[in-house]
Amino acid sequence: MSEQITAIYADEDGNILDAAGMQGMGRTGRENILLKPEDLIPLPDSADLMLLPDHLAVGMSSNGEIMPISGLAVSAILPAGYTRLYMPAYQRAEEADRLPLYGYTAVVVYHNSLYCAAVYTDENDKWDPVHYNTKELKNLVKRTKKELPGNRIVEQVGGCSLKWHCCTAQNLFYRRWECGIPTSPVCNANCFGCISLQPAECCPSPQERIKFRPTAEEIAEVGIYHLLVAPDGIVSFGQGCEGEPSLAAENIAAGIKLIRAKTDKGQINMNSNVGWTEGVKKIVDAGLDSLRVSIISAREEGYDAYYQASYHLEDVKASIRYALDHGVYVSLNLLYFPGFNDREEELAAWQDFFRELPVQMIQVRMMRHLAESLRYD
């Protein structure tokens, strides 16, 4: 069994080949580096392989020279629960377009098999792709539309399920686990990694943003429908197809009260940047159970570089403090980008952050970009 870590590439026909004699590399920040065995895990069965147009694969030759390979770089797109350690090593053509927002992960040949530069960080089988996109999904969407006629949220998440294959959306129709209730067409940040809205000159977004404002009654109808029967039921505001949910605080708060007037089952969650503290307070006071906060840095400079928001990191901290003080379970969705979060100044800032705000959980999430997209230095 070979101990060599070998680079791979894709030829002009899309065939994936190993680059004999070229050591496999990964990318952190804007630097290509050699991969080590401890960086690698076997490629998960449910992972996908994706070519990077106009990005040449890069490896290290036997004489130690880092050089491009005459073929396209290949990336692994990992299922939920995995966190990439390195991006694919590549050389970008000057005329290359920005790539769509996916968690591009280095993949190589090791022990005569495909391995990727990642770690398994979230042991939750519920997000395994095997549970989604089943042959009966289309009929389940039709059933729910008949049971909740005229509800625009159902129409929205039905499209998200069938067109964009969103797992959280699909759970509404499977009547289980966590389902999303999108509510806000607007946002108070301009994230580099926004998956629902990007400027025309940027990379294409992998989802379409909601174009309407659901009423409290529409919100409650979906919430009650789901929580009454779903095992481990959760309804979540703040989905990939919307902006910032706290900006819809009036309708969300009213919807939560209507839900809780009918059932105390399940959990009500919000995924949020929590930058608008007044909106967060209204939703917390209405009966929010849990709050997942999207965040990339505990330093103002690092935070602003990504979110480009109309609020400040201190507003985020104030919202988290209010939620913790009012018994809400708070977790962080920590956006991880190789070469950024692992810098010394970032780690030091997180130590201070957690001393001040002892949240209950940290979940690492991949930031969907390649290195040239985020300007942080």
Located regions from the model:
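N-terminal cationic-hydrophobic initiation segments that often serve targeting/anchoring roles
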Residues: 114, 227, 260, 284, ...
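Core AdoMet radical
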Residues: 178, 182, 198-279, 286-316, ...
